[in-house]
Swiss-Prot record:
Belongs to the BolA/IbaG family. One of its GO terms (biological process) is intracellular iron ion homeostasis. It holds the Pfam family BolA. This is Uncharacterized bolA-like protein C8C9.11. InterPro entries: BOL2, BolA, BolA-like_sf. GO terms for molecular function: 2 iron, 2 sulfur cluster binding; iron-sulfur cluster binding; protein sequestering activity. One of its GO terms (cellular component) is cytoplasm. It comes from Schizosaccharomyces pombe (strain 972 / ATCC 24843). It comes from the Eukaryota.
Length: 84
């Protein structure tokens, strides 16, 4: 079973995030996660390319999760969202 701390550590070690938010939507069961990842690695990439990058980097844990929802932003996009 995957927990939010393990997922956060893996994201920190593989995606160079400047901001991470992780919610376990399964009540602590580790089967349904929603994540927000802000990383300069996403700069200039389409949404599909960002998701593919995340899926590739996290493939070892995603295979054990029933549902994984991701929102991926570049630092500039995240700043713009926060300014609204």
């Amino acid at each position: 079973m995957v927990n939010a701390q393990q997922l956060e550590l893996l994201i920190q070690n593989t995606l160079e995030p400047t901001h991470i938010e992780i919610q376990d939507m399964s009540g602590g069961c580790g089967q349904n996660f929603e994540v927000i990842i802000v990383s300069p690695l996403f700069e200039g990439k389409s949404t599909l390319a960002r998701h593919r990058l995340v899926n590739h980097k996290l493939q070892e844990v995603i295979k054990d999760i029933h549902a994984f929802t991701q929102k991926c932003y570049s630092p500039a996009q995240w700043e713009a969202l926060q300014a609204k």
